[in-house]
Amino acid sequence: MKITKLEKKKRLYLMELDNGDKCYITEDTIVRFMLSRDKVISEEELKEIQDFAQFSYGKNLALYHLSFKARTEKEVREYLKKYDIDKNIVSQVIANLKEDKWINDGQYAYAIINTNQLSGDKGPYVLTQKLSQKGISKSTIEENLKEFDFSEVAQRVANKLLKKYEGKLPARALQDKIIQNLTNKGFSYSDAKIAFDDLDSQVDQETTQELIFKELDKQYTKYARKYEGYELKQRLTQVLARKGYDFSDIASALREYL
């Protein structure tokens, strides 16, 4: 077979043969096989050219995708799937990129965890979930998590939460709120509890009284329409307890309020 045409089409070249066959190839393919118009190639050579063109095209696409930011093997595979590249070729591209250090799931995981240590607010459980979604293996994630101590991150987050909620919640509710937020962010309950215990959080009696009377004003208006006497007192006690107030503080406030 003879090459009758080599014409550039954006990032690829259109190669036409005298038997009517056409295929798109990369510039790397032209250089590798020293292709030119009127060159004669065999069926076997054509197959090699087509396979390498797919590989070269796939690698160029992957490198373009990686030029914006680091990505995992799974992310690159999914990107290449959009371009209908043969699965075997995709695997060859991935292997080549890993060999050249363009893809390294271990380094990716380390970088994400390290950034979180410096300025993030996530605990190990949430990080594990996020990295797993990126296709990183459980063993790779665990290996990298072992390199870090999350107590400083938990303490940093706990301090921010304290600033947000202090003076707005009674002591027990404040503890519950901070610990719940920390566990939602991926810290274990024990780490969350330690972080809270290390806080300089003192909800004084005056603040508690102010909060409980403010809450009583709101709840009394709601329940006094339906209840009175003992039943009203019970309803108010229940709702204040759910809000995190101690029963002794509730009883004291109700004696003064009712």
UniProtKB/Swiss-Prot annotation:
Keywords: Cytoplasm. Pfam families: RecX_HTH1, RecX_HTH2, RecX_HTH3. GO terms for biological process: regulation of DNA repair. It is found in: Cytoplasm. GO terms for cellular component: cytoplasm. Modulates RecA activity. Belongs to the RecX family. PANTHER family: REGULATORY PROTEIN RECX FAMILY PROTEIN (PTHR33602:SF1). This is Regulatory protein RecX. It comes from Streptococcus pneumoniae (strain ATCC 700669 / Spain 23F-1). The gene is recX.
